[in-house]
């Protein structure tokens, strides 16, 4: 088993993962309920941050933006004027540019889906690069890091670098939101299955995911670098991740004059709390429509006595079958309890936080970025903060047969 440990290892891995979040491939995905719920959860915390903004001319910094999966969420806010996406994976940024150009075209044609906004993309390791030096004349109203913050806790040095970027790039009345695994939840599950936490070779798993601690870890200590190996079917394969001890998180916030405004110990609480905007809650069932159809087919197989681990269990759960299901046949998803336990075990691994400046009045402000006519982006527009040059010819060859668009390459 090859374990991915460095940012470049992880970048190489994500380069090979196809666009499971787009189009028909997603409808046939085993982890569709997880993807749909996580998308709703991200939208909910993004709207929470948005509601704290006094201005309606918002700038966004998306750290570890990947393939730009959250671009549409920000577009739907209707008030974003500038978006900056940063990621260590060049191939993901190419996909993000394609997605942005498509969204810009849609918004120019129909403003009811939001207003057009300018986007820039930067190739950088957000866990080490001093991004505030690159964006030295810019501060952002909303800063996000979705499902990636745990990589920053590999060491005190990487965590310091990350939180330094957040502190220096967040506007005085801005907010930072992150979703990441919950250490307490992981330890509680290990204890419930009778594991000796002082030993190595600890494992949590079901048919969809696994968490493995190959070496003994001092879980009681709030030490950096508490490594485990995470695998999620169709999404993340045998990747080294790091537990985030909330004592460390709070200490890092304190050192950078930041304060936790909201903490949601697991994502399920987003549906229950009054802190999440009602608009987001009302959209939950709509965003889970595909999952409702998927669960309908899945339950048919389970009711026949089949198990999710059976070789032929997934044979009839494909895009064509899902498309054929009439909405009158299905039960709307209004509560997470309607999902099978395998999916809930994964969803309940994660928590969310919203962080703000402790003393906003002491934070130096910057002028807003104003771009009258947003323009499409190309691969050549990517700002490269790594030591490796970008070879456009090689990129074209690697994407051959998958994507060739003048709006991206020319």
Each predicted region: which residue ranges?
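C-terminal lobe and adjacent flexible extensions of AdoMet/dcAdoMet transferase-like proteins
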Residues: 218-410
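A short glycine-rich, Lys/Arg-flanked "PGG" loop and its adjoining helix->strand segment in the class I
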Residues: 158-172
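A short acidic, Gly/Pro-enriched loop at the edge of an enzyme's catalytic core
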Residues: 131-143
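A short SAM/SAH-binding and catalytic strip from SAM-dependent methyltransferases
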Residues: 140-157
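Class I SAM-dependent methyltransferase SAM/SAH-binding core
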Residues: 69-128
């Amino acid at each position: 088993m090859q374990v991915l440990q460095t940012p470049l290892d992880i970048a190489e891995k994500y380069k090979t993962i196809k666009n499971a979040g787009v189009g028909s491939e997603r409808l046939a995905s085993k982890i569709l309920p997880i993807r749909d719920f996580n998308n709703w959860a991200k939208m909910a915390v993004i709207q929470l941050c948005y509601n704290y903004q006094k201005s309606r001319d918002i700038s966004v910094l998306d750290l570890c933006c990947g393939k730009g999966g959250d671009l549409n969420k920000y577009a739907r806010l209707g008030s974003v004027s500038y978006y900056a996406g940063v990621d260590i994976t060049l191939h993901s940024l190419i996909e993000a540019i394609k997605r942005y150009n498509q969204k810009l075209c849609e918004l120019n044609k129909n403003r009811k889906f939001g207003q057009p906004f300018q986007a820039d993309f930067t190739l950088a390791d957000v866990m080490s690069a001093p991004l505030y030096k690159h964006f030295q004349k810019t501060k952002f109203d909303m800063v996000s890091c979705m499902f990636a913050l745990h990589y920053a806790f590999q060491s005190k040095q990487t965590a310091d670098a990350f939180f330094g970027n957040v502190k220096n790039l967040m506007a005085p009345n801005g907010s930072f939101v992150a979703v990441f695994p919950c250490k307490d939840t992981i330890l509680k599950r290990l204890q419930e299955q009778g594991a000796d936490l002082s030993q190595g070779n600890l494992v949590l798993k079901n048919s969809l995911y696994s968490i493995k601690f190959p070496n003994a870890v001092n879980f009681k200590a709030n030490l950096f670098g508490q490594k485990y190996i995470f695998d999620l079917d169709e999404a993340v394969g045998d990747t080294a991740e790091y537990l985030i001890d909330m004592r460390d998180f709070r200490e890092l916030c304190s050192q950078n004059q930041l304060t936790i405004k909201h903490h949601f110990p697991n994502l399920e609480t987003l549906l229950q709390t009054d802190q999440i905007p009602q608009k987001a809650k009302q959209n939950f069932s709509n965003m889970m429509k595909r999952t409702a159809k998927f669960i309908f087919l899945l339950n048919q197989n389970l009711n026949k006595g089949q198990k999710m681990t059976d070789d032929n269990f997934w044979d009839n759960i494909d895009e064509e079958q899902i498309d054929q299901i009439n909405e009158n046949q299905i039960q709307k998803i209004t509560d997470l309890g309607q999902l099978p336990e395998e999916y809930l075990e994964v969803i309940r691994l994660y928590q969310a936080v919203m962080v703000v400046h402790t003393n906003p009045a002491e934070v130096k402000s910057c002028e807003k970025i104003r771009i009258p006519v947003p323009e499409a982006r190309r691969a050549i527009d990517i700002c490269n903060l790594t030591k490796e040059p970008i070879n456009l010819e090689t990129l074209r060859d690697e994407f051959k047969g998958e994507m060739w668009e003048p709006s991206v390459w020319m």
